[in-house]
Amino acid sequence: MKAGCSIVEKPEGGGGYQFPDWAYKTESSPGSRQIQLWHFILELLQKEEFRHVIAWQQGEYGEFVIKDPDEVARLWGRRKCKPQMNYDKLSRALRYYYNKRILHKTKGKRFTYKFNFNKLVMPNYPFINIRSSGVVPQSAPPVPTASSRFHFPPLDTHSPTNDVQPGRFSASSLTASGQESSNGTDRKTELSELEDGSAADWRRGVDPVSSRNAIGGGGIGHQKRKPDIMLPLFARPGMYPDPHSPFAVSPIPGRGGVLNVPISPALSLTPTIFSYSPSPGLSPFTSSSCFSFNPEEMKHYLHSQACSVFNYHLSPRTFPRYPGLMVPPLQCQMHPEESTQFSIKLQPPPVGRKNRERVESSEESAPVTTPTMASIPPRIKVEPASEKDPESLRQSAREKEEHTQEEGTVPSRTIEEEKGTIFARPAAPPIWPSVPISTPSGEPLEVTEDSEDRPGKEPSAPEKKEDALMPPKLRLKRRWNDDPEARELSKSGKFLWNGSGPQGLATAAADA
């Protein structure tokens, strides 16, 4: 041993704590395998010869007072082979434990601290052996052993409901990490779940052949297994729920003796040798915490997943691929022509400003052309009026004239009244009696064709584009102002307004 680095002797008999060999600083490895400070404090609290230095606070659960801070710092420096250790440095180490929720400072009391035994998870504090014959005072709290705080599920995977709260830590978590709270999340167990046989301590991890009847479901026949020291950090949590985990349990039992962890961001340093089975939290498989992995549930899940994909045009979610799993075929009701090839229908992009105006103009011009659709066949392509045959124009004019002569007789209106009625918006379109209007068959009715959904004569391409974007009423007004021939026809009483006399005028007014 080095000079000045004498080690506190391990308690052999009687009471107190029994630490493993790795917890003591050896000469061969001066910088590793150190014992933790809070281990050391608990060790001092268990020894009667240090009652004048540090002791449990009378009447308080888990609270202790440092009576001689300098002596405690000196003892800690001797254990760590640091002669310059003082209470200032030691208190900084204690403040580190505040965030880890191992202990906290008692307010209003100097040099008084309290262990947080309710939330304390001690994976690195094994082999604690509190004996009934020890010299612990009555006011001292019972130091929790790992078996009193956690349950360890048996290896029999056919009884997943025996342990409601499984153990997340085994004795294998002592593998030279030395960090007292690396996996110290807040996990509580109900007092009703603690069996009487849970007093078997962590020596089970060293003696692999020892009886496991002291754990959770003790009546189950157990099989021999490798020592926990040889296993990874955690016990098998694959088939058992964890209430603090955001994921549900995995449906596939893991390999015996090898860790099977759920995919969790909290476990960033887990090895990658396990058979990862993604939990149903990643894929909506079931809502229960434990379920039987039968083909009926698989079939129901695959059916609902495929139907949701087909209905909402979503890309299918990834499904965990298990090597020994036979997936039943889908049974979605699909037409035979759709089963061969499925085409995803995409929504068209929103129309721009020009396309929107064009759609609105076509919607407004559609009701205007409805009275004449019975007599005129629908046109597919918009053509200038100059290219049309004048014979067809004359024939359509005669049909319109015959249609208007069957309506009745009223005196013709003036131009101003007609223009005012066009841009008015009556509550209900009135009934228009028509007048007998005679149109000479020799004159081409370009203005009559003009009042429909396409321009009659288009001198240039920009004007054609402007007319296409223009509402039909404004286009009609502009044609009226620019065409002197139409004015002469109207003054002589021979002008067909909107192709069907006053009836077309009423339709245009109703659409305003």
From Swiss-Prot:
Biased composition (Basic and acidic residues): 380-406, 453-468, 479-491
DNA-binding region positions on the chain: 35-116
Cellular component, GO, one term: nucleus
N6-acetyllysine modified-residue sites: K388
PROSITE patterns documented for this protein: ETS_DOMAIN_1 (PS00345), ETS_DOMAIN_2 (PS00346), ETS_DOMAIN_3 (PS50061)
Record's subcellular location: Nucleus
UniProt xrefs under InterPro entries: Ets_dom, ETS_fam, WH-like_DNA-bd_sf, WH_DNA-bd_sf
Biased amino acid composition, Polar residues: 158-184
Record GO terms (molecular function): DEAD/H-box RNA helicase binding; DNA-binding transcription factor activity, RNA polymerase II-specific; DNA-binding transcription repressor activity, RNA polymerase II-specific; RNA polymerase II transcription regulatory region sequence-specific DNA binding; sequence-specific double-stranded DNA binding
Residue numbers carrying Phosphoserine: S139, S159, S315
Sequence position, cross-link Glycyl lysine isopeptide (Lys-Gly) (interchain with G-Cter in SUMO2): K381, K388
Region: Disordered, residue numbers: 136-222, 336-512
Membrane-spanning ranges: none
Top-rank lineage group of the source organism: Eukaryota
Role according to the record: Transcriptional repressor that contribute to growth arrest during terminal macrophage differentiation by repressing target genes involved in Ras-dependent proliferation. Represses MMP1 promoter activity.
Similarity-based family: Belongs to the ETS family.
Name of the protein described by the UniProt record: ETS translocation variant 3
Organism listed in the record: Homo sapiens
Source taxonomy: Eukaryota, Metazoa, Chordata, Craniata, Vertebrata
